[in-house]
From Swiss-Prot:
It comes from Aeromonas salmonicida (strain A449). GO terms for biological process: ADP-L-glycero-beta-D-manno-heptose biosynthetic process. Signal peptide: none annotated. PANTHER family: BIFUNCTIONAL PROTEIN HLDE. GO terms for molecular function: ATP binding; heptose 7-phosphate kinase activity; heptose-1-phosphate adenylyltransferase activity; phosphotransferase activity, alcohol group as acceptor. In the N-terminal section; belongs to the carbohydrate kinase PfkB family. The keyword NADP does not apply. Catalyzes the ADP transfer from ATP to D-glycero-beta-D-manno-heptose 1-phosphate, yielding ADP-D-glycero-beta-D-manno-heptose. Residues 344-475 are annotated as: Cytidylyltransferase. This is Bifunctional protein HldE. Homodimer. Its EC number is 2.7.1.167, 2.7.7.70. It catalyses: D-glycero-beta-D-manno-heptose 7-phosphate + ATP = D-glycero-beta-D-manno-heptose 1,7-bisphosphate + ADP + H(+); D-glycero-beta-D-manno-heptose 1-phosphate + ATP + H(+) = ADP-D-glycero-beta-D-manno-heptose + diphosphate.
Length: 475
């Protein structure tokens, strides 16, 4: 399955659930305590990260989505710390702060990246009035593309059926990371993402792939779901839907350091991808890739679009061809992480001819990746006159993307690509013709960034205008 990253910035993701604060105390262990046979950790570094539903929202925001987080906290220092962290990553938080409850906090003591102890500070919110959070959900739904329910069984989601009903009535898909064995409360959700242990706790021991699919399909029908995605650790993931063949996705992890928060990454990537316009199959495949990245990190972590682009490049040599500006910037960042030299050129390329092909082949040889920025129809018309272009923007870009020398093709609507060049900042900017480098649009921006601007010669005797003239004469 070929995957191109969507424009995550368009996605609006609402996350509701059990928010937590994860704290990590790091330090060496050089001796045993004289008070008891336990190691003494000399704490040298303290770290705090959002956990639970907060980590789900953090993962969506890390992809570039507009994330909103709703949940229950105490009126304490931990809630302030959590809110401050989320504000720092531009996640909009609207917590119900309760005076009689502590914010759920999990403190982990680590030495040499090995967890020695975990301390939990929590009291379940099971007796809290559900309307307090429901009112906030109703306010947030109209400005959301998808809703995630992140259930850790701590009590924030004590009216799951009501939340699902309101979201589905508004036409908003609901993805649920379930907890426990009572799946009845998730009836009518769009998709559930249980791990294998959670799945078997509901359906019983699974005996092979066929049994997995059969039992999964029974759950889909029983609880009126659109789909079920079972995450299976080293066995990857399986997507199950009624009336469609199952989709098995092999695990992508190369090294596993910590599975903490991997489920959060899966559901956030899946939901954000769907909100950005991907199909369910594509979104599941991308979530699988994200899971393979995050388990290679210590603790609850996030995955960036650049990391995804790099992983996709490694897996399938994809992410090339016609792109939006946002997609291009991610691809360029990923290329730079791989140490690749990025070359950029631009033009109308109205009727592609041998001169164009030769020029682009020569430009491509100057680096590892070649970007071709193409004037849109309106831009060409302003530059060339009312009779141009002959071919539309989409057609011109499709032809360019088919050339072996070209990696990425992107449109620009202005008369010059100066703004786009300033955003991309290629290592080498090339232009064909009789220009002086200093006269080329983007020269100042590229050279100020340490890049180079170079002029290449066009092949003699090749001209789009001449071709058009010849066609008209022979017309």
């Amino acid at each position: 399955m070929k995957i191109t990253l969507p424009e995550f910035g368009k996605a609006r993701v609402l996350v509701v659930g059990d928010v937590m604060l994860d704290r990590y105390w790091h330090g060496p262990t050089g001796r045993i305590s004289p008070e008891a046979p336990v190691p003494v950790v000399k704490v040298e570094h303290i770290e705090e990260r959002p956990g639970g539903a907060a980590n789900v929202a953090l993962n969506s925001a890390a992809l570039g989505a507009h994330a909103v987080l709703l949940g229950l906290t105490g009126q304490d220092e931990a809630a302030d710390a959590l809110a401050g962290q989320m504000a720092g990553v531009k996640v909009a938080c609207d917590f119900v702060r309760l005076a009689d409850y502590p914010t759920i906090t999990k403190l982990r003591v680590l030495s040499r990246n090995q967890q020695l102890l975990r301390l939990d500070f929590e009291e379940a919110f099971h007796d809290v009035d559900s309307t307090l959070l429901m009112n906030k959900v109703e306010q947030a739904l109209p400005s959301s593309d998808v809703m995630i329910l992140s259930d850790y069984g701590k009590g924030a989601l004590n009216d799951v059926p009501g939340m699902i009903q309101r979201a589905r009535a508004a036409g908003i898909p609901v993805l649920v990371d379930p907890k426990g064995t009572e799946f009845e409360k998730y009836r009518g959700a769009t998709l559930l993402t249980p791990n294998m242990s959670e799945f078997e706790a509901v359906v019983g021991k699974v005996k092979g792939e066929e049994d997995l699919v059969a039992k999964g399909l029974a759950l889909v029908k029983r609880f009126e779901l659109e789909a079920l995605l079972v995450t299976r650790s080293e066995n990857g993931m399986t997507l199950i839907r009624e009336g469609q063949p199952e989709l098995h996705l092999p695990a992508q992890a190369h090294e596993v350091y910590d599975v903490t928060g991997a489920g959060d990454t899966v559901i956030s990537t899946l939901a954000t991808s769907l909100a950005a316009g991907m199909s369910l199959d594509e979104a599941c495949a991308l979530a699988n890739t994200a899971a393979g990245i995050v388990v290679g990190k210590l603790g609850t972590s996030t995955v960036s679009p650049v990391e995804l682009a790099n992983a996709l490049y490694t897996e399938q040599e994809t992410g090339f061809g016609v792109m939006s500006e946002a997609q291009l910037k991610i691809a360029v960042q990923a290329a730079r992480l791989r140490g690749e030299k990025v070359v950029m050129t631009n033009g109308c390329f109205d009727i592609l001819h041998a001169g164009h092909v030769s020029y682009l082949a020569n430009a491509g040889k100057l680096g590892d990746r070649l970007i071709v920025a193409v004037n849109t129809d309106g831009s060409v018309r302003r530059l060339k006159g009312p009779g141009r272009p002959v071919n539309s923007t989409d057609r011109r870009m499709a032809v360019l993307a088919g050339l072996g020398a070209v990696d990425w093709v992107v449109p620009f609507a202005e008369d010059t690509p100066q703004r786009l060049i300033a955003e991309v900042l290629p290592d080498l900017l090339v232009k064909g013709g009789d220009y002086k480098p200093k006269d080329i649009a983007g020269y100042d921006e590229v050279t100020a960034n340490g890049g180079e601007v170079r002029v290449l010669n066009f092949e003699d005797g090749c001209s789009t205008s001449d071709i058009i003239k010849t066609i008209r004469e022979r017309g």
